[in-house]
């Protein structure tokens, strides 16, 4: 899967006008997956999020680590599109901060005390702003069944 909604100029039309960028992303993905020919963009076509249980005694925080992603950054001042839900299943916008090692995002929401679900760019008109070092956008995702609980502070 590749992401194309980051360069769509009309969110009501699923066919991007920029066919060259879409074609290049598909070609790099094929080279990597079918022929194991690593190009600098190939493993970065899809960010693979993995939830990390909230920790350090703060149940309203959740960390999402992105494999195949280094030097995460946003194309806008704030990272938009992350949402958190608690046990009630109601999603609220989350504040997203890139952690120091630049492959993990810290998410918080004052309205969610114990996070059980995380989603990113989960809207028909979403245009992802989170990018990796090759300026490839993160894919939309929905992580559910995040264990409710806190891992003790490890020092």
Description of each model-found segment:
Residues 1-23:
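Conserved, well-structured interaction surfaces
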Residues 70-155:
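C-terminal beta-sandwich/jelly-roll accessory domains of carbohydrate-active enzymes
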Residues 12, 60-62, 103:
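Structural beta-strand/beta-sheet cores of well-ordered domains, especially the beta-sheet scaffolds
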Residues 2-4, 67, 121:
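Generic beta-strand/beta-sheet core signal
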Residues 32-78:
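Surface beta-strand/loop "capping" patches
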Residues 7, 32, 124-126:
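Short loop/turn segments at secondary-structure transitions that flank enzyme active sites
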Residues 18-36:
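Non-catalytic, well-ordered alpha-helical segments in soluble enzyme domains
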């Amino acid at each position: 899967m590749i992401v194309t909604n980051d360069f769509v100029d009309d969110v009501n039309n699923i066919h991007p006008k920029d066919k060259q960028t879409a074609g290049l992303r598909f070609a790099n993905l094929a080279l990597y997956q079918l022929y194991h020919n690593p190009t600098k963009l190939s493993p970065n076509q899809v960010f693979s999020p993995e939830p990390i249980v909230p920790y350090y005694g703060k149940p309203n925080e959740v960390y999402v680590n992105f494999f195949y992603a280094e030097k995460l950054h946003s194309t806008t001042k704030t990272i938009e599109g992350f949402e958190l839900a608690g046990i009630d299943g109601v999603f609220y916008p989350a504040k997203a901060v890139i952690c120091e090692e630049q492959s993990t995002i810290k998410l918080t929401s004052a309205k969610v005390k114990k996070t059980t679900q995380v989603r990113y760019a989960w809207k028909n008109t979403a245009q992802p702003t989170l990018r990796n070092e090759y300026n490839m956008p993160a894919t939309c995702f929905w992580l559910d069944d995040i264990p409710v609980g806190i891992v003790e502070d490890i020092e």
